């Protein structure tokens, strides 16, 4: 039975980049990874109303640089930058190193997979019909430039006794094409009947080497000389050009002694 690979992990180093960008040896790797997970969970709770799409963490030279992608950057920054300063000081206490916080605005939140999934889960928690929430999100995404979208919900939908899975798709979502820019995200709705999981795939068109792809330096190929070739060697052309006079195809032969012809 075929299963779906994670679209982001499948495209790492091709058209996607890592969300945590740092290097650690074997002794520190687990602790730093656990620290990143804790920072993301803290930011998710702290900025619940700021529509945060994703968080990128970098660690250059005993520092930390955190980039927060949000569709409402004003909520993150706060009045006169007060909220972001409090956030920065809290993150420095957690990580133990100087932290720089950058805010990036998401221009089209209707086509961001994480924001779509979070929006659907919030509607499910407010007891809105799951079909209505899913179809409305699909219509908004297609209207604002997405080439395809697929949404799947699983759990006790509408409070039924037996859990089931339902999904809807509009446009095309080529999961096996590496150059396809697939934005994938998941979210969970905590309802009175239990947890309902939501998965979202958004196809934004083909891409290779742009957007969030890692930069790879291209090495110029050197033309190697032909094996056992000497300078000045040249193969004769097939049409006979460059051959000595009389050797070209179709050239008239000259008469001479012993050719059986006598001049008249």
From Swiss-Prot:
Region: Disordered, residue numbers: 217-264
Compositionally biased region (Basic and acidic residues): 230-241
GO biological process, one term: translation
Annotated InterPro entries: KH_dom, KH_dom-like_a/b, KH_dom_type_2, KH_sf_prok-type, Ribosomal_S3_C_sf, Ribosomal_uS3_bac-typ, Ribosomal_uS3_C, Ribosomal_uS3_CS
One GO MF term attached to the UniProt entry: mRNA binding
Entry annotated with the keyword Cytoplasm: no
UniProt KW Lyase keyword: no
Residue ranges constituting the KH type-2 domain according to the UniProt record: 39-107
Comp. bias regions, Gly residues: 253-264
Cross-referenced Gene3D superfamilies: 3.30.300.20, Ribosomal protein S3, C-terminal domain
GO CC, any one term: cytosolic small ribosomal subunit
Record keywords: Ribonucleoprotein, Ribosomal protein, RNA-binding, rRNA-binding
Alphabetized SMART domains for the sequence: KH
Biological role stated in the UniProt entry: Binds the lower part of the 30S subunit head. Binds mRNA in the 70S ribosome, positioning it for translation.
PANTHER family: 30S/40S RIBOSOMAL PROTEIN S3, SMALL RIBOSOMAL SUBUNIT PROTEIN US3C
Family: Belongs to the universal ribosomal protein uS3 family.
Quaternary organization: Part of the 30S ribosomal subunit. Forms a tight complex with proteins S10 and S14.
Record's protein name: Small ribosomal subunit protein uS3
Name of the coding gene: rpsC
